[in-house]
Amino acid sequence: MVLTQLRIASRRSQLAMVQTNWVQAELEQAHPGLSISVEAMATQGDKILDVALAKIGDKGLFTKELEAQMLVGRADIAVHSLKDLPTNLPEGLMLGCVTEREDPADALVVNQKNAEHQLDTLPEGAIVGTSSLRRLAQLRHHYPHLVFKDVRGNVITRLEKLDAGNYDCLILAAAGLTRLGFGDRIHQLIPSEISLHAVGQGALGIECVEGHPEVLEAIKALEHKPTAQRCLAERALLRELEGGCQVPIGVNSRIEANELLLTGMVASLDGKRLIRDQQRGPIDRCEAIGKELAETLKSQGAGEILAEIFAAVRPEA
């Protein structure tokens, strides 16, 4: 069966549309005869901006509405920031493609008042804006003298709040800033020794309906195998820990020769307990490496930390 048209479901946030438009352009270049349309929509995570993400709940916060469009036959694929895509997908859907990763690091963004500071020179009581429990826990561990405040909204809104003086600095994904044209606002890339990034951060995941080989073949033109292998390991670790996008689990992965080196971290919300370890193995065992590292972290107490966090941030009824 020859594929003649492709319907993409996307979040309608500015960053999501930049990413989806890139996917559309790349697919049109790879398949000149293919007619591609985009349907943009708001997800639950886009609509609820006055509650911390972890309190809303984690299952499909930024993906469920897009998946519903595919399941009822109104869309063929959905484009996600891979870090937002749950590791367990609805029956009938699959992760069909992972694109080449941008720099997955977290970035420090400062206002003019703090232009002379790096993360480790911020004064006591400086207000750091982040909506991520992962960043919060790691930064509390290393910088207990700083004050952390939740920040919601799209990237532009967050930058406006920063420049208005509501925060001294923000911690954001470097990849998102770069894709939106705000790479010049990156004041410092935070070393992985301080902040391990989110699972899948910096990569795009293209979700599709199972049983449609022509769609899968079309989107595979955008697949970047080394990124996919790294992200498979990261997602296997997250799945094995039964974590989600809104818990303090951080990772870093590297491919060295034919081996994959995966580092993983679980921390308590107050940052006082932080468990970190790594696993190395042949790259064709990427998912097994993720599972094995998860078991190692569990043996060191990660399960107990996560159980406490799930109880503390359980979504409000």
Curated annotation (Swiss-Prot):
Keyword Transferase among UniProt keywords: yes
Modified residue annotations for S-(dipyrrolylmethanemethyl)cysteine: C245
Protein name, UniProt field: Porphobilinogen deaminase
Keyword terms: Chlorophyll biosynthesis, Porphyrin biosynthesis, Transferase
Reactions listed under catalytic activity: 4 porphobilinogen + H2O = hydroxymethylbilane + 4 NH4(+)
Swiss-Prot/TrEMBL cofactor(s): dipyrromethane
GO MF term set: hydroxymethylbilane synthase activity
Free-text cofactor note: Binds 1 dipyrromethane group covalently.
Signal peptide residues on this chain, from the entry's feature table: none
Purpose of the protein: Tetrapolymerization of the monopyrrole PBG into the hydroxymethylbilane pre-uroporphyrinogen in several discrete steps.
Pathway: Porphyrin-containing compound metabolism; protoporphyrin-IX biosynthesis; coproporphyrinogen-III from 5-aminolevulinate: step 2/4; Porphyrin-containing compound metabolism; chlorophyll biosynthesis
Family: Belongs to the HMBS family.
PROSITE patterns linked: PORPHOBILINOGEN_DEAM
Keyword Transferase assigned: yes
Self-association and partners: Monomer.
Note: The porphobilinogen subunits are added to the dipyrromethane group.
SUPFAM superfamilies (alphabetical): Periplasmic binding protein-like II, Porphobilinogen deaminase (hydroxymethylbilane synthase), C-terminal domain
Gene3D superfamilies given in the database record: Periplasmic binding protein-like II, Porphobilinogen deaminase, C-terminal domain
GO biological process: chlorophyll biosynthetic process; protoporphyrinogen IX biosynthetic process
GO cellular component, as recorded: cytoplasm
Pfam families, per database record: Porphobil_deam (PF01379), Porphobil_deamC (PF03900)
Known EC number: 2.5.1.61
